[in-house]
């Protein structure tokens, strides 16, 4: 080997020794794979599905100002939304804190120290008062001020990976806020339409009670005239008492719903003063296929996906910790034993330092941190895969229930039409003078009972359709 090639080899030897001396990274179990990663799914809907798909503000489709106002109040004032917002701000602040570690830092410092030197210590000569020797002891007033700078070189990408992990957490928290928003809106809408269903049922029950009172009045008149016995009107009295009990139950349910709406909307007044409105008509506009290709529109799956991405970046940061850390430091200062000399040019001092930290033996600490990062990542992936399967099942169950209730409502509508025809025939016979007016009331009561059953089915369909909207992501777009 000639001299020209010998010196470069000697110069590279410390670098090779540094890399070879790093703590060894052991093999770990294989990472889990994501089931339909949400980031790879297009959120744009096929043209055939756009008309029947929920919008991000799907509740506006009901064209109900009361409902819109309740949901807006919930989104603005609900504690759950405030918690979600603060979680985002915390994640953003943590991401900024990690990002600042990747740049240079410059500090200014100044200090002054008054001290007496010991004549018997290491600095004993400075305790003497000998101007010729440059000592004016034993008292000195030392002063220092200047700039110090430092820069941690992120050669292996450790800080960049940590920043990416934090940003993934920020995106996950934002998706969680949207999920909270959709859950709140869905809860308010379901309670609101349940209240409207009970209000409509209350109206029908009052009509039934009115018809029953008509029959009771007729039976009493017949009994007073000696035409019927006292036993003939007992069944009608019992039915009227049951109707009154149902009215009391409905009133109690409405009060409970109002209390729950007050809690969700953080309403401070005693009463919401809701006004009854007609229930929306039953309709079915479901997409033909509800599969994995549409799951990216669910905020909870987006949040789970970003937690997975964050965990993968955490693994990269844990791997980068096995390699050397390189730090650059510099200072430019004024330093003097006496304050009178502090601002002289001769009191200036400066320097540059390059530091290297090489992990060689760490008792397995770095490998343990890497194992933890990989285990947490696998847990995030497993949780994501579980959420995907549950999301598909949620959509399938909700869609099936909506379709079943839509069919039940159609059958119930036919039953109500048949019952109304019976009422029409009784009314015609009454108009012809064939039967008494109480017989018309007797014909109306079964029809009103069927109307009550229809309202309950209609309310169940509304509740199921709102739950399906939530299962479909509520129109969320990342």
Curated annotation (Swiss-Prot):
Its main location: membrane. A lipid is attached at residue 22 (S-diacylglycerol cysteine). It is a lipid-anchor. GO terms for molecular function: efflux transmembrane transporter activity. GO terms for biological process: response to antibiotic. Transmembrane segments: none annotated. Keywords: Antibiotic resistance, Cell outer membrane, Lipoprotein, Membrane, Palmitate, Signal, Transmembrane, Transmembrane beta strand. A lipid is attached at residue 22 (N-palmitoyl cysteine). It is found in: Cell outer membrane. One of its GO terms (cellular component) is cell outer membrane. Residues 1-21 form the signal peptide. InterPro entries: OMF, OMP_efflux, RND_efflux_OM_lipoprot_NodT. The keyword Protease does not apply. Belongs to the outer membrane factor (OMF) (TC 1.B.17) family. NCBIfam families: outer_NodT, PRK11459.1. Could be involved in resistance to puromycin, acriflavine and tetraphenylarsonium chloride. This is Putative multidrug resistance outer membrane protein MdtQ. It comes from Shigella flexneri.
């Amino acid at each position: 080997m000639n001299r020209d090639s010998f010196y470069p080899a000697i110069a590279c030897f410390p670098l090779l020794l540094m890399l070879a001396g790093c703590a060894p990274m052991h093999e770990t179990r294989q990472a889990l794979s994501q089931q339909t990663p949400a980031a790879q799914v297009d959120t744009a809907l096929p043209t055939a599905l756009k008309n029947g798909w929920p919008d991000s503000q799907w509740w506006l489709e009901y064209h109900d100002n009361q409902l819109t106002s309740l949901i807006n109040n919930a989104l603005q004032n609900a504690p759950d939304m405030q918690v979600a917002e603060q979680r985002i701000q915390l994640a953003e602040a943590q991401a900024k804190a990690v990002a600042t570690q990747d740049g240079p830092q410059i500090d200014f410092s100044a200090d002054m120290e008054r001290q007496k030197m010991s004549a018997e210590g290491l600095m004993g000569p400075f305790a003497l008062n000998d101007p010729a020797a440059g000592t004016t002891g034993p008292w000195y007033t030392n002063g220092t001020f200047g700039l110090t700078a430092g820069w941690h070189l992120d050669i292996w990408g450790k800080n960049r990976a940590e920043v990416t992990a934090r940003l993934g957490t920020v995106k996950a928290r934002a998706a969680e806020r949207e999920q909270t928003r959709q859950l709140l809106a869905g809860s308010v809408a379901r309670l609101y339409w349940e209240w409207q269903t009970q209000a409509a049922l209350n109206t029908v029950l009052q009509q039934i009670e009115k018809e029953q009172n008509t029959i009771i009045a007729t039976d009493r008149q017949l009994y007073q005239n000696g035409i019927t016995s006292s036993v003939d009107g007992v069944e009608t009295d019992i039915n009227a008492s049951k109707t009154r009990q149902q009215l009391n139950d409905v009133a109690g349910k409405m009060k409970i719903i109002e209390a729950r709406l007050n809690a969700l909307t953080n309403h401070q007044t005693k009463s919401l003063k809701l006004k009854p409105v007609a229930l929306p008509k039953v309709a079915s506009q479901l997409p033909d296929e509800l599969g994995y290709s549409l799951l990216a529109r669910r905020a909870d799956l987006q949040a789970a996906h970003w937690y997975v991405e964050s965990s993968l970046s955490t693994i990269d940061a844990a791997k980068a910790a096995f390699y050397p850390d390189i730090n650059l430091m510099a200072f430019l200062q004024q330093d003097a034993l006496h304050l009178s000399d502090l601002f002289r040019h001769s009191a200036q001092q400066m320097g540059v330092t390059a530091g290297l930290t090489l992990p060689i033996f760490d008792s397995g600490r770095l490998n343990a941190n890497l194992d933890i990062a990989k285990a947490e990542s696998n847990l995030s992936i497993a949780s994501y895969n579980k959420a995907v399967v549950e999301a598909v099942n949620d959509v399938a169950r909700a869609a099936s229930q909506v379709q079943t209730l839509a069919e039940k409502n159609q059958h119930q509508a036919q039953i109500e039409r048949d019952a109304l025809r019976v009422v029409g025939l009784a009314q015609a016979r009454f108009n012809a003078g064939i039967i008494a007016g109480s017989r018309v009331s007797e014909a109306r009561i079964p029809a009103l009972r069927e109307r009550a059953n229809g309202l309950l089915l209609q309310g169940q369909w509304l509740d199921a359709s709102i739950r399906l909207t939530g299962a479909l992501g509520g129109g969320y777009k990342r």
